[in-house]
Amino acid sequence: MPLNCDTKTAGEISSSIPSGSGSHQPAAQSSGMKIAEIFTSLQGEGLTSGYPTIFIRLAGCNLSCSYCDTPASRQGGMDMNVSEVVAGALLQKPHYVCITGGEPLLQKDEVAELARQLIKAGKMVSIETNGTVPFDDLPSDISICMDVKCPSSGEFSNINLLSDLKSTDSVKFVVGTDDDLQYAEKVIMSHPTKAEIFISPIYGTDYQRIASYILSRNLPARMQLQLHKFIGLP
């Protein structure tokens, strides 16, 4: 299905599929997916922060976090098959691809096939997940970013999945309150992981307070700010 390409004011090229229901029917030879949008921007966080990245946002989520910045992706979405999603992504130039949501692993079989095809095409693929769906059966050359839900989110993650993360994966704690910081510290110290650990303040919170906490507790984690939000990118 053709994508609606437009130029964003910040200068990035965006190929966006609007959220909502679509009438397109998947081809018989390829599994169907619910896609909220496909666009290109700078990766704002994680291991590849700052790199131009193709984002494939899947529709549908099993959580309802209090600070969710993409609530429209919880439902709806355009019906596309895996081959069409790959074709849409490959119209974009960046080497990195981030499959996000929503919760991508609610469409795990299709996501696994999508990742395999993108990797075969020479892309580096990461998947962002809320840590409620097991991912140990995904292709090993995918980089996983697990978002552990802290108390202020109003939701939860399966922290036992932290042991399944590899050294090429990452784990993120989105924090805004003292309770969040204390919870993150407790999980970090009680659930060892091979993954890189990030502490990510909710946009607009007191960043210095969070930095001071990380320093005072000598946490084995990297503080990260959401780069894309500071420079006005999606």
UniProtKB/Swiss-Prot annotation:
Keywords: 4Fe-4S, Iron, Iron-sulfur, Lyase, Magnesium, Metal-binding, S-adenosyl-L-methionine. Mg(2+) binds at residue 70. Residues 48-234 form the Radical SAM core domain. The keyword Translocase does not apply. It catalyses: 6-carboxy-5,6,7,8-tetrahydropterin + H(+) = 7-carboxy-7-deazaguanine + NH4(+). [4Fe-4S] cluster binds at residues 61, 65, 68. HAMAP family: QueE. Catalyzes the complex heterocyclic radical-mediated conversion of 6-carboxy-5,6,7,8-tetrahydropterin (CPH4) to 7-carboxy-7-deazaguanine (CDG), a step common to the biosynthetic pathways of all 7-deazapurine-containing compounds. This is 7-carboxy-7-deazaguanine synthase. The lineage of its organism: Archaea, Methanobacteriati, Methanobacteriota, Stenosarchaea group, Methanomicrobia. The gene is queE.
